[in-house]
């Protein structure tokens, strides 16, 4: 789906950048991050969201026998995402720890130097990783951004590749993808000249 972070306010970008990590730490639907692996035990299926500069997507994969589980997970990403405050707090703590470690990492220093050279020290779309960036990450903003970017499936294209038979796949698509709520609004990305 077109749009991505190009449609967000600058103040929302830090929250958008780490939103997918929080979702992965939160679980899905009614299942916490500790319950979900138990529910999926013995199955090979996953689905995850991504928000890029110009697009947002939900990708999934599975073995053939677990296609329905993967489609259920895609469906839940649209209609019942899970944002868990504990998952958010874990990510913030990881970022705080990373901030300490990266001070001694020559690769990170080089990356910061390149960012400053290309965009300046205070570019709102290409911020340096520091205390200010971490402070601007908001749990509530993440939920709002997610609803904005994934609240309408009308402009998503679904591509399915694999060895599943069409006769088996069609009723699953009708059950899980065709039932995702949409409104007729289609978006496009915005050129923010970064």
Q: Where are the regions a protein language model picked out?
A:
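A generic local secondary-structure boundary/capping motif
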Residues: 146-148
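An aromatic/glycine/proline-enriched structural segment found at the starts
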Residues: 152, 157-194
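M16 family metallopeptidases and their MPP-like homologs
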Residues: 1-24, 28-80, 92-100, 106-136, ...
């Amino acid at each position: 789906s077109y749009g991505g972070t190009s449609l967000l306010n600058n103040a929302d970008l830090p929250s958008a950048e780490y939103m997918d990590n929080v979702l992965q730490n939160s679980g899905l639907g009614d299942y916490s991050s500790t319950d979900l692996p138990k529910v999926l035990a013995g199955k090979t299926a996953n689905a995850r969201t991504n928000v890029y500069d110009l697009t947002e997507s939900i990708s999934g994969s599975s073995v053939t026998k677990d296609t329905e589980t993967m489609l259920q997970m895609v469906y839940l990403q649209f209609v019942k995402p899970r944002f868990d405050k504990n998952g958010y707090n874990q990510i913030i703590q990881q970022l705080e720890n990373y901030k300490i470690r990266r001070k001694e990492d020559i690769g990170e220093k080089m990356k910061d130097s390149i960012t400053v050279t290309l965009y300046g020290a205070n570019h709102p779309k290409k911020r340096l990783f520091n205390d200010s960036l971490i402070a601007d990450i908001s749990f509530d903003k993440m939920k709002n951004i997610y609803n904005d970017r994934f609240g309408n499936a009308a402009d998503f294209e679904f591509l399915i590749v694999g060895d599943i038979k069409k006769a088996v796949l069609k009723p699953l698509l009708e059950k899980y993808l065709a039932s995702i709520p949409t409104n007729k609004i289609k978006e496009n990305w915005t050129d923010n000249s970064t």
